[in-house]
């Protein structure tokens, strides 16, 4: 009876944003396809929907198969504002695909400025002359040394390279990616490696950026290198004194393990208490992994909602 009444059907699974904005941990790409296809089969009017789309191939597939007529892609457009243009111009390899981490949704929930793991320029639109991908050339032909090949180091090397500097990126480990090499092994977080993969791909297009894995550097090495600019992107470590979001006095916990310890292969025995005072992904994902390994896990958090 209602099939032909609207001019457009905007289809979504009912319920709060937890349904249409699911993260990569809890849903695959295009997870609402069956629901959308059902509505499309009942009407001749145009149908649009969402469902964590990131890949142009998946978007085109649903349109060609008649699942819907056009795609709603908010998070993919946050990660890459030029997604439609890159598809139109045949530059699919340059698309900065959304990883489904939902840091954008978290920012919206908290009423703070929007941010994006894939797109560090998100929220800078108010700046005069701002552009998320075009950056002014550096006025001099100088050398820059970036120490640390994690997400921040890769982004710094890419940006400096686009500005025209001669860039060397030194990473102490054998591979690039930093924390991603560990975190992407947690349940549902494999897509997070896109942060590394996209930057390595784009750096590969720049002849003025060189990558040096397995290259630890101390102060003497930096001085000997003789760069005009040195950037430290060596990351940080998890605290083991109980301090997180909540204001508490640091305490000693000799038996406590941090995520760094677990990723390094520390032996985990007996019932496990995972204490979460970060309120993001790490504690829940670690608890899920430990439970899958057969441990009895108790999840404790200071957050009002787990």
Description of each model-found segment:
Residues 1-147, 151, 155-167, 239, ...:
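Flavin-dependent oxidoreductase catalytic cores
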């Amino acid at each position: 009876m209602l099939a032909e009444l609207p001019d457009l059907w905007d289809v979504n699974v009912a319920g709060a944003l937890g349904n249409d904005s699911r993260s990569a941990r809890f849903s695959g790409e295009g997870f609402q396809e069956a629901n959308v296809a059902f509505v499309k089969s009942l009407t001749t009017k145009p149908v649009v929907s969402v469902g964590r789309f990131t890949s142009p191939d998946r978007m085109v597939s649903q349109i060609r198969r008649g699942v819907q007529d056009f795609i709603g892609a908010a998070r993919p457009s946050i990660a890459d504002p030029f997604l439609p243009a890159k598809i139109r111009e045949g530059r699919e390899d340059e698309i900065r695909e959304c990883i489904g981490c939902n840091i954008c949704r978290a920012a919206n929930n908290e009423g703070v400025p929007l941010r994006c793991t894939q797109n560090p320029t998100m929220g800078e639109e108010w700046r005069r002359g701002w552009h998320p991908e075009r950056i002014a050339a550096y006025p001099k032909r100088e050398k820059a040394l970036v120490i640390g090949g994690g997400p921040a180091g890769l982004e710094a090397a890419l940006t400096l390279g686009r500005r025209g500097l001669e860039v060397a990126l030194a990473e102490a480990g054998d591979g690039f990616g930093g924390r991603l090499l560990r975190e992407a092994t947690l349940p549902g977080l494999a897509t997070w490696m896109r942060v590394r993969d996209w930057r390595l791909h784009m750096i590969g297009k720049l002849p003025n950026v060189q990558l040096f894995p397995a290259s630890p550097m101390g102060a003497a090495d930096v001085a000997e290198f003789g760069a005009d600019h040195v950037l430290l992107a060596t990351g940080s470590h998890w605290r083991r004194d109980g301090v997180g979001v909540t204001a508490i006095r640091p305490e000693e916990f000799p038996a406590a393990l941090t995520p760094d310890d677990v990723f390094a292969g520390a032996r985990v025995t007996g019932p496990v208490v995972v204490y979460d005072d970060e309120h993001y992904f790490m504690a829940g994902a670690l608890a899920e992994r430990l439970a899958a390994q057969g441990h009895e896990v108790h999840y404790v958090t200071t957050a009002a909602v787990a």
